């Protein structure tokens, strides 16, 4: 899920720390991307995507808060979160390192040893939202076609079709779909600020307020994409790179999230992927070949330099006491 390496190894090999799965076939091991049951999507106009740099993400949660505000995501409170009924469209996954040795590989005993916490654990933050998969497992199981794929690479929801079977949430490998157990707005049990005329003014009029019994998820701020495209159309031009930003990418204080059109060769995301495609760029759970629109850049730790600094500080302290 998270891929990382140290600076010394990365300098010698830009793919250090990368996990590249292979699937056994009659023709020998192949990359999952070479094996598929589905025809590819013909994206002629735009292909929206994101690149998230794990080196830059500090886990501050700005993306989460801005997403809540932009997309009218309900604030359900501690009691509902304790029942695993949180409604965030984006979550910050947090992973800790272990002191377990790697000799046991991927055996069950090896994973048991990894449960032992490190004395000084390292942490990785990973923003996780709908990956907008081209081979989306959620789309194939919906009996009413409430979740479909757009011609621009977005996995989209049609709320008035959804009947709440939750098959899509069950089939999502990233677990990023949220079910409305209640009508959260205009409900005295949740978010009191939304129950009066003044409080409702904070709602974004460009985003549908979901009703009870439907699934919702990250839309990649499709309302902003459509507004940007319409503004460009009025001026008889294509959208300029950076003109359209999702709420999460706009609010990120470290610019860890890069959003843009991957079909635009001059866009920041295309330039970044052209450099990192054979380097740090990876997809989460590549082995299941769902072909996400969201890529991550592996985390590179400067362990060697940190160790040298610590040793230098210890030596200086010892010399001072001597």
Language-model features and meaning:
Residues 1-322:
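Non-ligating segments of multi-cofactor redox enzymes
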């Amino acid at each position: 899920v998270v891929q990382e390496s140290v600076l010394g190894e990365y300098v010698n090999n830009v793919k250090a720390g990368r996990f590249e799965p292979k699937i056994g076939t009659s023709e020998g091991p192949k990359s999952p991307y070479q094996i598929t049951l589905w025809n590819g999507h013909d994206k002629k106009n735009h292909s929206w995507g994101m690149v998230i740099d794990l080196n830059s993400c500090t886990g501050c949660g700005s993306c989460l808060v801005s997403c809540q505000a932009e997309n009218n995501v309900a604030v359900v409170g501690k009691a509902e979160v304790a029942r695993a009924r949180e409604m965030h469209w984006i979550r910050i996954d947090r992973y800790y390192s272990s002191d377990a040795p790697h000799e046991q590989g991927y055996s069950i005993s090896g994973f048991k040893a990894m449960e032992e916490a490190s004395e000084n654990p390292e942490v990785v933050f990973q923003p996780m939202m709908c990956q907008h998969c081209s081979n989306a497992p959620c789309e194939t199981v919906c009996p009413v076609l409430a979740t479909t794929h757009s011609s621009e690479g977005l996995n989209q929801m049609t709320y008035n079709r959804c009947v709440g079977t939750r098959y899509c949430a069950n089939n999502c490998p990233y677990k990023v779909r949220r079910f409305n157990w209640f009508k959260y707005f205009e409900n005295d049990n949740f978010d009191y600020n939304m129950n009066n005329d003044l409080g409702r003014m904070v709602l974004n009029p460009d985003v549908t307020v979901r009703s009870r019994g439907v699934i919702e998820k990250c839309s990649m701020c499709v309302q902003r994409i459509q507004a940007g495209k319409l503004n460009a159309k009025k001026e008889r031009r294509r959208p300029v790179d950076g003109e359209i930003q999702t709420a999460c990418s706009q609010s990120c204080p470290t610019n860890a999230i890069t959003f843009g059109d991957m079909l635009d060769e001059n866009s920041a995301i295309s330039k970044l992927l052209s450099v990192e495609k054979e380097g740090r760029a990876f997809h989460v759970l590549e082995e299941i070949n769902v072909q996400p629109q969201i890529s991550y850049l592996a985390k590179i730790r400067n362990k060697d330099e940190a160790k040298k600094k610590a040793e230098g500080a210890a030596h200086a302290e010892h010399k001072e006491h001597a």
